[in-house]
Amino acid sequence: MRYPEASSPLSSRQVREELGGADAVIVALDELDAAAISAGRNLKVIAKHGVGVDNIDVGRAALGGITVVNAPGMNSTAVADLVMGLLLALQRKIVDAHNSLLEGRWERFHGPELVDRTMAILGFGRIGHEVAKRAHGFGMRVIAYDPFLAPAEFERAGVERCEEIDAALAEADVVTLHLPSTGTGPLLGGEAIGRMKPGAVLVNAARGDLVDEDAVVAALRDGALAGYAADAFAVEPPVGRPLLTAPNVVFTPHIGAFTDHANELMGMSVVEDILAVLSGRAPRHPVIIKD
């Protein structure tokens, strides 16, 4: 067993150097492209310590007879907690107030309350449901968009269903993203951001490429967007990106799933599935390629 020590995700080259004769590999945000997978001459199973597999070439793995597994549902509460933390930090200017106090100032920072405001959740899966519970606890009205869910699912959660993304954007004071990568470019580009309610804020704790970060910067600077909070970025780490110097932002380094409880659940899940594959049994959480 090898456990590379690194402060940031490993590149494809670094992964290739580490794989050697490994039968299994567990990755978080490390890059497993076709070249890295091909370097794993004995590789039988790739386990994602998380849910999204956009950093893994699942198609190349399938061609090589390599099983890919993930850990769905294990980090839902952890991510939902962080979403609300980011939102509160953004709205109540907690980071600005903290930094101001450390610099010796005693400033009063004003911001909106969440009660009676409307949150739009784009992508109403496990995490979206958990975010809705927390938003309801703050007295928010919650609307959601998810084309793959039956209307009854929204009703059970006490959430209003939006049939189109644009309808959700136009109504919401807060928009939070919980969708997989589109693979075809940003879901929210300049035009979509322009259709958001004036003074709205955007939270992205899903995938960095869901938003056009340059469009976000422009909207923040001209005041069309009141704030942006993110735990995911188009390039990670986002060193030197214009987004980092934009006004009214709060960021975390992709730590949505990083709680003790979530890490334990995900770790146990992927280890159990690795052992299943290596012993010839079917894993509980295989990643299936959709046509």
Regions found by a protein language model. Name each.
Residues M1-V69, A170, G189, G194:
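An N-terminal-biased, well-structured beta-alpha scaffold segment characteristic
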Residues R2, I143, D209:
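Conserved beta-strand positions in the Rossmann-like core of class I SAM-dependent methyltransferases
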Residues P4-E5, H49-G50, I66-T77, D146, ...:
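Short beta->alpha connector loops at strand-helix junctions that form conserved
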Residues A34-I37, P147-P242:
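Rossmann-like adenosine-cofactor binding region
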Residues G64-I66, P72-T118, E130-G137, P283:
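Phosphate-binding beta-alpha-beta segment of Rossmann-like dinucleotide-binding domains, i.e.
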Residues V68, G199-D291:
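Rossmann-like dinucleotide-binding domain for NAD(H)/NADP(H)
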Residues F124-G125:
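Glycine-rich Rossmann-fold phosphate-binding loop(s) that bind the pyrophosphate
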